[in-house]
C-alpha cells in the first residue's frame, strides 16, 4: 500500500473534548485508553488528511497556506456526524470553529513554532491529520460518551510516488453504497484497502495499489464500474486527449485534490469528462492501445501515474497489462498539472477560479 517517505511528526498534538468544548496541547506520543469503543469497534473513528505549506514571511513571521481546505473540514464534519447519535449532532463543530481550532489552538501555539520554522526553511510538504476518538474506557457497543478531536501535523518527502504498479481487484469491495460509508474518511474503510493490496501482491509481487470496482458483484464483471484506488481517487487519460473523472457517489470519497486537478486540467485546455467508467471499457481501451495513463490522485501524493496496471478476470487470471504511453502529450500534461497544484501552495502559480488559497499569519 502507498506509504509516506521521509516522515517527521511535530512534537505536539491537539486534543479537543467535544462535550466540554475544551482544548489542550499534548505530547505527540500521548495515549488514549487501550480499551474503548474507538479502538475495539472503530466507533467514532474518522479522520482527515489536509495538505499545507509553511513559508517564511516578512518581519521574521511565518505564514501557513491551505488550498480549498474548507472542503476537507466539511468532509470531516460529515464523518463526525455519521459516528454520533441523533441526540449528539449538536456536538459537531461548524467549519469556522474547526478552522479556528486548528489554526489558533494548534498551529499558533508557541510549542509548534520550532517545527514550523524548520518546515519553512526546508520548503517541505506538510500534512495535517485531524482524527476523532472516544476517550472513555469502555467496551460497550454504543455511541461515544467522551468524544474528542485530535490533530497532529507532520512533514514528509513523498507519498506513493512514481513508478508504481496497480492491480484491479474485482472480488473485494472497499465500501457498500447502501451504508453510505464510502464517501466518508472512516477507519472502517481502510482495512479493506490493505487487504486488497495483500491480494494484489498475490497476483503480482510488485503491486503497490489496488483498483476497486463497484459493489454490484452480481453483475458481469465488464458491466461493473470502476470506483477508486485503495486509498486515492483515479483519473484515466485517453489517447483522444480526454481525461475521465469518476463521478462522486456514496462509494467514492469526494477528493478535494481531484476536484482541483479537474479544474487545473480544464484550464490547460484538456477535455475532462465526469462519467462512469466500466471495467469493460477499461479492458477494451487497454487492449486497443487507447489508454494513455491511469493516475492515482489524493492529498498526500497529489497525482502519480501508474507505470504498470494489471487487469484480471473473475478468476483473478491476468487478461491484460497496461504500460503508459509516455510519448503522448497527456502523459506530460498530467505531470505539469501535479506541479501546478503544488505551486499554488507555494504562490508560484495563481489559483484558478473555483480554487481558494487560504493564508494564515503565525
Give a label for each model feature.
Residues 1-211, 215-222, 263-362:
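Conserved alpha/beta cores of soluble small-molecule-handling proteins
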Residues 251-254, 284-285:
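Accessory, usually C-terminal, subdomains that scaffold auxiliary metal cofactors
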Residues 217-250:
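Glycine- and Gly-Pro-enriched alpha-helical subdomains that act as flexible
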Residues 244-245, 262-264:
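Short, charged/polar low-complexity linear motifs in solvent-exposed/disordered segments
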Residues 255-260:
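Feature captures the catalytic cores and cofactor-binding loops of soluble hydro-lyases/lyases
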Residues 69, 250-251:
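Extended, low-hydrophobicity, polar/charged segments
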